[in-house]
C-alpha cells in the first residue's frame, strides 16, 4: 500500500496542477473518482491488463463521457507507464490536495438514527466554526451507537455516542 501511494503521489500532484491551471478542479475530481471505480472493477482490471489493449483504448475505457481532453491524455500517460493499478490511490491523493487547496474538510457523521436536516445543519455550522473552513459531509447510521453521533474528519474524531460513554463508564467502574 505504501508503495502504491508513493507511485501515485506524482500523478496526483500532476493531475491537480493541470486541473487547477484549467480551472477544472471539481470536474477532474469527479472524473478521477469515476475512472478509479471503473479500474477497480475486477472484470475491467482484467481487460486493462490485456496485452492487445493500447494506452489510448485504456484511457477511452476509463474516461467519463465528455471528459476534458487533457484528462484523457493524463489517463493515456498513466496507462503508457503501466500504472493504472494505482488509479484509486491517485484519486484519493487528488482529493486530499483539492480539499487542502480549497480549505475543505470532509466529515463523516455517523449517528444512531437518521439526523433531521436542522440537526445536520447545526452540526455542520459548528464544524465550520471550529475548523474555520468549508465542510463536506457524508452521513451514516449505526444503531449500535444507541444514541448521539460520531464525527470523523480524518484528523479529529468527536465521539458523542452513548455507546462510548457507557464504555468509558464501564472502564472507570472496573478499575
From Swiss-Prot:
**Coiled coil start-end:** none
Disulphide bridges in this chain? none
Report the SUPFAM superfamilies cross-referenced here.
N-terminal domain of the delta subunit of the F1F0-ATP synthase (SSF47928)
Q: From the Swiss-Prot or TrEMBL record, state where the protein is found.
A: Cell inner membrane
One GO molecular-function entry: proton-transporting ATP synthase activity, rotational mechanism
Q: Which is one Gene Ontology cellular component term of this protein?
A: plasma membrane
Keyword check for Transport: yes
What InterPro entries does the record tag this protein with?
ATP_synth_OSCP/delta_N_sf, ATPase_OSCP/dsu
The membrane topology noted for this protein in its Swiss-Prot or TrEMBL record is: Peripheral membrane protein
Keywords, in A-Z order = ATP synthesis, Cell inner membrane, Cell membrane, CF(1), Hydrogen ion transport, Ion transport, Membrane, Transport
Listed NCBIfam families: ATP_synt_delta, PRK05758.2-2
The record's subunit annotation is: F-type ATPases have 2 components, F(1) - the catalytic core - and F(0) - the membrane proton channel. F(1) has five subunits: alpha(3), beta(3), gamma(1), delta(1), epsilon(1). F(0) has three main subunits: a(1), b(2) and c(10-14). The alpha and beta chains form an alternating ring which encloses part of the gamma chain. F(1) is attached to F(0) by a central stalk formed by the gamma and epsilon chains, while a peripheral stalk is formed by the delta and b chains.
Function per UniProt: F(1)F(0) ATP synthase produces ATP from ADP in the presence of a proton or sodium gradient. F-type ATPases consist of two structural domains, F(1) containing the extramembraneous catalytic core and F(0) containing the membrane proton channel, linked together by a central stalk and a peripheral stalk. During catalysis, ATP synthesis in the catalytic domain of F(1) is coupled via a rotary mechanism of the central stalk subunits to proton translocation. This protein is part of the stalk that links CF(0) to CF(1). It either transmits conformational changes from CF(0) to CF(1) or is implicated in proton conduction.
Entry similarity comment: Belongs to the ATPase delta chain family.
Record-given protein name = ATP synthase subunit delta
Amino acid at each position: 500500500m505504501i508503495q502504491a501511494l508513493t507511485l501515485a503521489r506524482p500523478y496526483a500532484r500532476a493531475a491537480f496542477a493541470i486541473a487547477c491551471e484549467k480551472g477544472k478542479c471539481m470536474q477532474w475530481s469527479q472524473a478521477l473518482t469515476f475512472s478509479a471505480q471503473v479500474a477497480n472493477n475486477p472484470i475491467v482490471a482484467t481487460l486493462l491488463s490485456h496485452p492487445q489493449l493500447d494506452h489510448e483504448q485504456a484511457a477511452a475505457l476509463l474516461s467519463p463521457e465528455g471528459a476534458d481532453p487533457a484528462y484523457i491524455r493524463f489517463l493515456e500517460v498513466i496507462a503508457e507507464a503501466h500504472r493504472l493499478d494505482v488509479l484509486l490511490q491517485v484519486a484519493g491523493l487528488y482529493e486530499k490536495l483539492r480539499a487542502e487547496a480549497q480549505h475543505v474538510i470532509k466529515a463523516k457523521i455517523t449517528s444512531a438514527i437518521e439526523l433531521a436536516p436542522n440537526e445536520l445543519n447545526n452540526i455542520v455550522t459548528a464544524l465550520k466554526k471550529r475548523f474555520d473552513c468549508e465542510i463536506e459531509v457524508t452521513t451514516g447510521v449505526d444503531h449500535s451507537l444507541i444514541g448521539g453521533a460520531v464525527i470523523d474528519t480524518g484528523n479529529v474524531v468527536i465521539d458523542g455516542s452513548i455507546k462510548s460513554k457507557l464504555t468509558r463508564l464501564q472502564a472507570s467502574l472496573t478499575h
